């Protein structure tokens, strides 16, 4: 562990270096344009080159071709649509299911207005937003797991 000395701003040599811009970045090389115009494109193009190289040299196999004449008994959407699929599958009225799905973003938009008196960044000092987030996460995971099960055990997840 090293000892860190607080800089003495009354030192005339240090003040002269700071006036020349030789403080934190001692070599005097500015971030603009060197880093932003030269280093970032190199990193971005290098990342793209690595991705293209992996895609060309090691392509992922798609699997067997689909048979249009043989469909599965139950077609499941992608995993990120499981909670929405479960809402539409469980609610008997489709209009009510669509309204339930539309109420989620509307409810999330109203959270800052409910808690506008609280200006803290710490989530433990914003109990309404934290509670809504935790309950929403649990409900979304519950619905997502239930969407993969048969309809008769989907709401209870086979636990009850």
Swiss-Prot record:
Transmembrane segments: 36-56, 95-115, 131-151
UniProt main location, coarse: plastid
Entry membrane topology: Multi-pass membrane protein
Top-level taxon of the source organism: Eukaryota
One Gene Ontology term from the biological process aspect of the record: photosynthetic electron transport chain
Keywords, alphabetical: Chloroplast, Electron transport, Membrane, Photosynthesis, Plastid, Thylakoid, Transmembrane, Transmembrane helix, Transport
GO terms for cellular component: chloroplast thylakoid membrane
The keyword Ribonucleoprotein belongs to this UniProt entry's keyword annotation: no
Annotated compartments: Plastid, Chloroplast thylakoid membrane
InterPro entries listed in its UniProt record: Cyt_b/b6_C (IPR005798), Cyt_b/b6_C_sf (IPR036150), Cyt_b6/f_cplx_suIV (IPR005870), Cytochrome_b_C_euk/bac (IPR048260)
GO molecular function: electron transporter, transferring electrons within cytochrome b6/f complex of photosystem II activity; electron transporter, transferring electrons within the cyclic electron transport pathway of photosynthesis activity; oxidoreductase activity
UniProt function note: Component of the cytochrome b6-f complex, which mediates electron transfer between photosystem II (PSII) and photosystem I (PSI), cyclic electron flow around PSI, and state transitions.
Similarity field: Belongs to the cytochrome b family. PetD subfamily.
Assembly with partners or alone: The 4 large subunits of the cytochrome b6-f complex are cytochrome b6, subunit IV (17 kDa polypeptide, petD), cytochrome f and the Rieske protein, while the 4 small subunits are petG, petL, petM and petN. The complex functions as a dimer.
The protein, known as: Cytochrome b6-f complex subunit 4
Origin species: Staurastrum punctulatum (Green alga)
Organism lineage: Eukaryota, Viridiplantae, Streptophyta, Zygnematophyceae, Zygnematophycidae
């Amino acid at each position: 562990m090293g000892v860190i000395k607080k800089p003495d701003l009354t030192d005339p040599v240090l003040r002269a270096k700071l006036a020349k811009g030789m403080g934190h970045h001692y070599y005097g090389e500015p971030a603009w344009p060197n880093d932003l115009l030269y280093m970032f494109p190199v990193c971005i193009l290098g990342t793209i080159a690595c991705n293209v190289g992996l895609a060309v040299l090691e392509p992922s196999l798609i699997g067997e071709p689909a048979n249009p004449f043989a469909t599965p008994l139950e077609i499941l959407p992608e995993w990120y649509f499981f909670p929405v699929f479960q809402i539409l599958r469980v609610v008997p009225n489709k209009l009510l299911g669509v309204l339930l799905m539309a109420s989620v973003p509307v409810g999330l938009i109203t959270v800052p207005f409910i808690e506008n008196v609280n200006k803290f960044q710490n989530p433990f000092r914003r109990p309404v937003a934290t509670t809504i987030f935790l309950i929403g996460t649990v409900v979304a995971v519950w619905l997502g797991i239930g969407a993969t099960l048969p309809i008769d055990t989907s709401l209870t997840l086979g636990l009850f």
